[in-house]
Amino acid sequence: VREHSIEVLLPFLQVCAGDAPLHVVPVCVGTGQAPVLRTAGQRLARVLERCRSRDGQRPLLLVSSDMNHYEDQRTTLRKDDLALDAALKGDADALLATVAREGISMCGAAPLALAFYALHAWSPDAAVRATLVMHETSAAVSHDTGHVVGYAGLRIFSC
C-alpha cells in the first residue's frame, strides 16, 4: 500500500498539539467493501470507547482524502457534489455506492466510510452528520480548469 496521508497530516497535528502529548494511531484502509468496512468500524468503535474511558476525553477521528481527480472543472464539481451529498448525511453506504456508480476518483472514500461506520457503532442512537467547511478545486490556484483535483473540508459529528 502506498498510503501517505499520515505523512501529510502528522506535521499539522504536531503544531496543533504544541507541547501537549500527541497519541496517534494511523489506520490504513485497503478495501472499499462495505461489509468489511462496517465490521472494521464496529471494532474501531470499541477501541475508541476504550481510549475515551482512560482519560475522559473523546478521541479524534481524522480522515484525509482528495475528492475527484484530473477531470475538467465542471465534471469534478459535479462528481464532488454527489460524493459530498452522501458524506454530509453521514451515510457510508450511500457514499461508497455513489463513488462506485459515478466513477468518482475520491481516494479516501473507504476511510471516510470507515469513520462513519465507527461513529454509528460508537453512538448507535446518535445521528452522524457533517458540515462543509470549504470546497474548492486546484483551479483556484493553478487557473487550469482542464485537469483539476477537488478538495473539501468536513467537520463530522454525532448528535
Give the predicted meaning of each segment.
Residues V1-P59, Y70-C159:
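Flexible, D/E/H-enriched segments
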Residues L61-V63:
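Residue-level marker for buried hydrophobic side chains located in beta-strands
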Residues M67:
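Active-site metal-binding loops of divalent metal-dependent hydrolases
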